[in-house]
């Protein structure tokens, strides 16, 4: 059975291991071989004053994580998920749906009105988020410029 809870500094070794195992594999193929760079990245996300991160556990094993932050905006309080993943061998087995529903309940109880996230439109996660009730923001685009 799954349980979820807010992550703490004591979970960072497991967070790092899970993050690498998911995002260095299909479909992402991100190169997180630089442990210092990964430590800095995760530290930036989890070290913010408004950081709010959750873990999904099966027994005592971390199998899912959501790293995000609460943002206060004119239209209400938001939770921006920066990173969300489920251990590869648990994907497609309702773990992600269970976890996201738990997160929704938790952040709603904290006054959050909207959850935001981004993903590629060419990966399975896109369909998962749509199934979970997320909609594309039609009037917003994501810009990038390599310098």
Residue map of PLM features:
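A short beta-loop-alpha structural element at the N-terminal edge
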Residues: 2-17
């Amino acid at each position: 059975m799954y349980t979820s809870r807010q992550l703490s500094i004591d979970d960072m070794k497991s967070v790092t291991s899970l993050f690498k195992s998911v995002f260095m594999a299909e479909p992402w193929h991100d190169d997180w071989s630089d442990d210092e760079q990964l430590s800095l990245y995760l530290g930036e996300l989890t070290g913010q004053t408004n950081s709010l991160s959750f873990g999904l556990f099966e027994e005592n094993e971390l199998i899912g994580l959501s790293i995000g932050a609460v943002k206060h905006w004119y239209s209400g309080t938001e939770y921006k998920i920066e990173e969300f993943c489920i251990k590869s061998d648990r994907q497609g087995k309702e773990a992600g749906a269970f976890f996201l529903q738990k997160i929704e309940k938790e952040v709603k109880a904290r006054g959050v009105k909207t959850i935001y996230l981004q993903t590629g439109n060419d990966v399975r996660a896109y369909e998962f988020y749509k199934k979970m009730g997320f909609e594309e923001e039609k009037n917003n685009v994501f810009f990038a410029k390599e310098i």
